[in-house]
Amino acid sequence: MLHRGIKFVHVAVLFFAAVLAFLFIRELDEDGVLGNSAVIFVFDSEDSTSGAQVARSIASFAEDHGVTVAREVPDLREPDGRRHLYMTGGEDSSGVSAWLNEGYPEFSSSLTTEVHPIADIGQRDPRGHYYVFGPPEAAESLVAEFSGLGLRADVSHPLSGGELITAYTNSVMYWSFWVIALAAVTLTGASVLLSARAYGILRLQGFSLVDLLVRDLRQLLAPWVVALGAVTAVALTFLGFYNGFAWLSLFATLATALAGLLLLLVLTTHVAVIALTFKVDVLRAVKGALPARAASVGVYLVRIPALLLALSVATDVAQVARDMETRQENRTAYAEAGDAVTIRLNGGLSGEKERVIEEIGPWLRRADGNGEVILAGRRDLQSLVPGSQLPPGEVLIVNETFLTEQPVLDPTGQRYMPVAQSDRAASGDRVQLIVPKSLGGNEAALTEAVVGVLGPDFDSRTQLDVHLAKSGQSVFTYNTGNQVYNAAHSQKEDRSHVQDPVLVIVPNGSQFVSDDGYTAFAAQEGVVFPNPDDVVSAIQGNRLGVYVVALRPVAQNSALKMREVVTEFRVQLFNLALTVTVLLIAGVGICAIYARKNSQAIFARHINGWKYVSTHRFILGVEVAIAFLLATRVPFEAWLQNKDLERIAASGTPLTQPLVDLTELDLGIIAGLVAVEFGAVLLALALFHGRIVREGATEV
C-alpha cells in the first residue's frame, strides 16, 4: 500500500493551489481591472484638447481597431471601495464591451465597479489610467493617438507574466507558495523513506524503478480523482456564493497551473527518493536499510533552508502582530473622528507641481481660516536638524483647530488651548512651539527645525513662543504616518499616535504655512476636513475636480488598512505553521535515518553501560549547534545592523532606516521556535533509542 503521507500531499496540493489562486486573483482585482492587455497612464497634457474631445477620439480609435478602452476613475466619496469605468462600446474580440450592459464581473467582494459609457465622462481632465482590452499592440497605437491630442503617456502590461513576477516577487503570497512547496516536498520525501522496506520487498520481486513509480501512480489515481472532485465542488460552491462565478475560467486556469507546478515538484521528489533507495542492495533494503549518508545530506538540504525561512517568517509574524495590536488600539480614536476626510490629489498632475500648488494651496488656506480644516502635518525631527544629535522623533505642524480637538498638556497637567482673540489682537499672529519636557534644553535646535518647516516670512525672534509639554504624552494625528519618513519607524508601522512629539502650532489660515506646505501636507493625508460637504462644495464651486480626485474617510481608511494587516497576519501565521511542520518532519527524519544506520552500535553501547548523552553525542552536538545558531542568528544580525546605523547617526547623517528593535514578542517567538525544533528532535531520538533498547538493533 502507498504511504498515507503521499496521498495526503497530493490532496493538500490541490486544495492549497485553489486557495492561492483565489487570494491572488482577488488581490489583482482590487489593484486593477482584470482582463486588460495593457494600461496607459496619461501623465501630462498641453491643455489643447478638452476631456470630451479626448473621449470622442478614444471611442473612434476603439471602433477602428476593434478594441475596448476604459478610463478608471475613483469614486469621489468612497475611493477605496468603489471605482468607475468609462468604456467605449461596440464589438471587440475580448467581449469586454458587454460590461456596459451586464456590469463588470467583480471577483473581489470588497470593491464595487460601476460601468458607464465613455461619453458620460464629460469635461473631466484626461490625465489618468486607461485600460486596453484586445491586442497588446493596440496600446502603442493609442499612445500615438494621445500624442496627437497633446497628451503624454506611458504603457505598461501589469497582467503580463514578466511584470507579475516583478511585482509579486517577495510578496507574502510568493513566499506562501514556496512554503507550501517545501512542505509538500518534505512530506513526500519522508513518506517514501518510511516505505523503504516495502520498496525493498518489491525490488526483491523484480520491480524496477519505473515499475515502482507506475505502481505508486496507479494507486494515487483513485484518491487523486476523488480529491479533485471534492476540491472542485467546494471551490465552485464557494465562488458561486462569493462572486457568482466571476472570472471562473481565470481562476480555473491559475489553480490548474499552480497545482501542476506543485505536483511536478512532488513527483520529482518522489522519483528522486525512490531512486535513492536503490543505492542500498536488495537484501539490506528488505530489512529497511537506508542510504544513510545521502539521505542525511538530503534532509539537511531541506532542513537548513527551512530553518532560515522559519526565522524570517517568525520575525514577520511578530512584526505584523505588533502592527495589528497597535491598529486595534487606535480604532477608538478613528471612530471619534466621525465623518472626517482627507483628500487625494490627482497623481496625473505630477509634472505640473507649480500649477497644483497655485490652486490647492490658497484654497486650503481659506478653508483653514474658515475653521473647516484640522491641520496635522508631520516631519521627521532628525531630518529637519541634521547633526544636532537630537533623538528620533516627529514634529507635528498643526493649527489651532487641532489643539481644540486633541489634548496637549503642560508639565502641570493643564491643557493648552488656542490663543485668545484679544491676546492675538495685541501681539499679532504668533507660532507656538511646544516641546516635550524630555527634550528641554534643545530649544535652539528645535527653533531651527521650526524655521525649516514654516514659510520664509517667519521670524523666530519675534513670532515664536516656546512652551514645555508633559513628557509621556501620546497625540493622535488622524493618519498612520506611512506617507512621511521617520528615522525610528518603518513606513508599514501605524504611527497614528505619536509619543512625545514636538508641536508647531500655527494660527488658522496664517501665512506661516506656505501654499507648498499646505499642498504637501494634503498629499500626505495631513489636512483633515471634519465635514466632507465642505470639500464637495469647494470642488463644485471652484472647479477643483481636476486636482482633487477623491475624499478618503479617515475612519474607513484605518479600517481598510486594519483588514489588510489582519489578512497578512493570517497568511504569515499559516506560513509559520507550515515551516514548523517542515522542521518537525525533517527533525524526526534525521533521527530515523540516524537510528537505522547506528542501531547496532546504539544497542551495543546500551548493554555496555554507556550513558545516553555519550551514546548519541554526535547527533546531540549537531542539534545543539543548530539550535544555538537558530537562537542567535536574528539577534546577532540585529546587533550588527544597529552598530552600522549608530555609526551613521554619530556622523550626523539622518538614518535611512530605523534601528532594529527586538521586542519580547520577537525573542519569545524565536525561543519558542528553538524549543519546538530542538524538543522534537530530542523526543524523536528518545523514542528511537527506547525502541532499539526494547526490541534489539535488528528491529528498527
Could you tell me what each predicted segment is?
Residues 162-181, 252-257, 559-583, 666-672:
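N-terminal membrane-entry
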Residues 2-160, 320-569:
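Nucleotide-cofactor and metal-assisted catalytic machinery
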Residues 231-258, 560, 627-674, 686:
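Short helix-loop junctions at transmembrane helix boundaries
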Residues 7-13, 210-236, 255-265, 298-305, ...:
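Selective transmembrane-helix segments that form parts of the transport pathway or gating/packing helices
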Residues 191, 196, 259-292, 594-597, ...:
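C-terminal membrane-exit region of the final transmembrane helix in multipass inner-membrane proteins
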Residues 186-221, 586-624:
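Interfacial "coupling" helices/loops that link adjacent transmembrane helices in transporter permeases
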Residues 11, 286-322:
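Internal/C-terminal transmembrane anchor helices
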Residues 157-280:
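Hydrophobic alpha-helical segments
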